[in-house]
């Protein structure tokens, strides 16, 4: 049995459905969703990620606007740029490519994006909706991608023991909220957690999101584990690897996502799904 999860294939299914939906929306409204991407500076990894997002968007009929700004821009000036996008009715969704330069107040910037256009789900209002169990607003795309993969391979999540290794606002925290809603028993671990391998090796599902290359070896899992590797670590210049020691772990668990080709494509698919959702929400608001 092939136990390596093909995230690219799953993402392509989502993108194919979105392409059809966008064409229907275009026929109905005579307009298309448009995604604005704010890129500050010239971080090589960020440039690659942005290119992937733009390429996938264009492939399914989403227009894009790339706003490329200098590394030296001040927080207040960046907020002014974001406000321009907030007020532009042609823009359905806005993302600010992270990380931002250290001189910029990231929290202020993420809070400046209009919640209705915050397709990354990072605005405090959208975060509050998610953690309050309110079905409104936007949910971070990586967390949505992880949940979709898990549900594809584990149809009944109720009562499952899940260990999330990593407590970021992008993955760990939002994913914990989604899994609690599915009635999982969720444990969040992090760099200060003790006896980590002892805790994670008892879990049905382990999500690795610590950002430390091949940190998690076979002792962290059991033969029935579903392993979701969210880590994206660049080594030796261009090679990308995950947080899990993939080569030595893959034969010792039930299912595992590779890096690359696992959660990355799913994240982009759900980013574009959120863009379409924002477009539909704005259009229905205008029509009513």
Swiss-Prot record:
UniProt record similarity statement: Belongs to the tetrahydrofolate dehydrogenase/cyclohydrolase family.
Keyword list, A-Z: Amino-acid biosynthesis, Histidine biosynthesis, Hydrolase, Methionine biosynthesis, Multifunctional enzyme, NADP, One-carbon metabolism, Oxidoreductase, Purine biosynthesis
Protein name from the UniProt record: Bifunctional protein FolD
One annotated Gene Ontology cellular component of this protein: cytosol
Catalytic activity field: (6R)-5,10-methylene-5,6,7,8-tetrahydrofolate + NADP(+) = (6R)-5,10-methenyltetrahydrofolate + NADPH; (6R)-5,10-methenyltetrahydrofolate + H2O = (6R)-10-formyltetrahydrofolate + H(+)
Record organism: Rickettsia canadensis (strain McKiel)
Lineage, top ranks: Bacteria, Pseudomonadati, Pseudomonadota, Alphaproteobacteria, Rickettsiales
EC number: 1.5.1.5, 3.5.4.9
Assembly description: Homodimer.
PROSITE patterns: THF_DHG_CYH_1, THF_DHG_CYH_2
